[in-house]
């Protein structure tokens, strides 16, 4: 019998995303290539702590999710959309910010991604 693994919601989300792959032309790639986030007072999902924990628990076989801290929420989503376009819509980045003005700034980038049919994952 296996031992129960206790995770927070944020840790479970990150662990799930790290294990999502897409296969095309016989090549397997991670669907969510990494995470970008600007953390402030209202990040309720616990994603920041989960990303740090994922980095600390990383194994040599590449089980970690890279994290970048951008300076602007709209630019962050636009960068994720550009990455999705560059990889032929087979990979994208996860974007997260605090609740409030930061989330609202992400909406414009999400509209651009939606109008161009580019995948981005927003938290």
Descriptions of predicted regions:
Residues 1-102:
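Thiamine diphosphate
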Residues 92, 102-105, 109-123:
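Hydrophobic or amphipathic alpha-helical targeting/insertion segments
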